[in-house]
Amino acid sequence: MNNKCKIINRRKSDRIYVGKVAIGNNAPISVQSMTNTRTTNISETINQILELQKVGVDIVRISIPNLKAAESFKEIKKQTNVPLIADIHFDYRLALQAIKYGADCLRINPGNIGNKRRVSEIISYAKDENIPIRIGVNAGSLEKDILKKYKIPTPDALVESAMRHIEYFDALNFNQFKVSVKASDVFLAIESYRMLGKKITQPLHIGITESGGLRNGTVKSSIGIALLLLEGIGDTIRVSLAAHPTEEVKVGYDILKVLSLRARGINFIACPTCSRQEFDVINTVNQLEKNLEDISTPIDVSIIGCVVNGIGESKIATLGLAGSHKKSAFYEDGVRQKEKIKNEEIIEKMEIKIRKKIDKLNNSKKNN
């Protein structure tokens, strides 16, 4: 496809850093997730963070519901090397402790963090340690006076909540922050981000909150996040799923991959199958995806069950397979190879060939 069709003009935004991860001002869109372990279970939380790192997470958020969790956060921070965000609600003092214990960023909720004095104290501590903050507005926890004014969560309500706290930050000359205005309703979230994006230059953390289980949540999040990204809105993302956090990261990268905003791992092109398929495409793709989850190098691999589209797709993929009777045609860099692969050996042989190609690409980069 003509690359001109893939250009997304991103919204101009300021640059902040969460740890060493740049956010905003055309930095690569970062993928976040959140642990769902008990923070006080230090070993379990660390293990989940390591799992998230294996699938490419850039930033991890951890809930700090009480002082004991804050103390656990301190130990977790010592034993991990990915930027950690302390998620704070209700008790502003926990934000102060999290900063003290090494948080790379704070998330505070305007709907429950308290009055201006409390926010000012958090900002003072964050300034001293050069720690950024996310103003995380959520449709499900708006301030009482705002909810009374608008009756129900609306884009105006979410944006007013965000702007109120942005004014606090501006008054204290604190500009190291990003903002989110999340809702579980896709239309509400999208319109809220559109409105906010026109008012401020700070980076925007985007997502559809509480989007549901793995299937429904993936669909809902993909639609909401992708629509915003296509409009150039969004500097960092989280796919919120009622599923294992690693699934959030995988879906996040898939969204960015589809939009050519960021690539990680293998992009499988696979047919939906019909009676023309010469081998079990569904099982083949599922097994290859599972076996090759560790791959981070971006390449396109086409697995098509017959020659109708198999040849054409293989010619534009890094590696391709066009199904044929008993043996299938194999392509590399668009060129058909002399070797054919027995259909019963496709999973094994293709995994070997993909890994070999990845090694070749990585070695070529090193030599250059």
UniProtKB/Swiss-Prot annotation:
Query: Cofactor binding mode, per the note?
Result: Binds 1 [4Fe-4S] cluster.
Q: Which reaction does it catalyse?
A: (2E)-4-hydroxy-3-methylbut-2-enyl diphosphate + oxidized [flavodoxin] + H2O + 2 H(+) = 2-C-methyl-D-erythritol 2,4-cyclic diphosphate + reduced [flavodoxin]
The EC code for this enzyme is 1.17.7.3
Top-rank taxon of the source lineage equals Bacteria
- What cofactor does this one take? [4Fe-4S] cluster
Q: Which InterPro entries match?
A: Dihydropteroate_synth-like_sf, IspG_bac, IspG_bac-typ, NO2/SO3_Rdtase_4Fe4S_sf
Protein residues bound to [4Fe-4S] cluster: 271, 274, 306, 313
Is Kinase found in the keyword set?
no
Q: Which GO terms describe its molecular function?
A: 4 iron, 4 sulfur cluster binding; 4-hydroxy-3-methylbut-2-en-1-yl diphosphate synthase activity (ferredoxin); 4-hydroxy-3-methylbut-2-enyl-diphosphate synthase activity (flavodoxin); iron ion binding
Pathway given in the UniProt record: Isoprenoid biosynthesis; isopentenyl diphosphate biosynthesis via DXP pathway; isopentenyl diphosphate from 1-deoxy-D-xylulose 5-phosphate: step 5/6
* Alphabetical keyword list: 4Fe-4S, Iron, Iron-sulfur, Isoprene biosynthesis, Metal-binding, Oxidoreductase
Q: Which GO terms describe its biological process?
A: isopentenyl diphosphate biosynthetic process, methylerythritol 4-phosphate pathway; terpenoid biosynthetic process
Indicate the family of this protein.
Belongs to the IspG family.
Could you tell me what this protein does? Converts 2C-methyl-D-erythritol 2,4-cyclodiphosphate (ME-2,4cPP) into 1-hydroxy-2-methyl-2-(E)-butenyl 4-diphosphate.
Q: Protein name, please? A: 4-hydroxy-3-methylbut-2-en-1-yl diphosphate synthase (flavodoxin)
